[in-house]
């Protein structure tokens, strides 16, 4: 029986490249001239810290980072930015987390979405991924379209397609 896995993974090398590209863009933008603005990638906690003088500039930094991530093939939904910015002294900063892996609550939403679609497939949660099994490839492709179209707030990839 054909099957595939729904996963949410981020290539950290591409994230590193995006951070370097964003830092390079900061040095060429006129609105960030003589402004202590920076990006900092923490691979251990899988987060990106943006720091600048004002909250408006921090928001611009986040927009630049999303643009660079998108150019490197990582969707903007993979970056989870908190509403409140940290303020200490003269600087504002925000630590945006990179979403990787499917949490249990998110996996349950995916399984419920698949079951409510009435497609003849079975979905089961396996750790940080969801395995979908069906009798025909067409049903599995329908599930892929459903997941891509469903606004689930996180980018997903489809791996391990077996016939």
Curated annotation (Swiss-Prot):
A GO cellular component annotated for this chain's UniProt record is: cytosol
Stored Gene3D superfamilies = 3.30.70.860, YajQ-like, domain 2
Q: Where are the transmembrane segments?
A: none
Q: Which NCBIfam families match?
A: PRK05412.1
The Swiss-Prot or TrEMBL record describes its family as follows: Belongs to the YajQ family.
Protein task: Nucleotide-binding protein.
Q: What is this protein called?
A: Nucleotide-binding protein PC1_1036
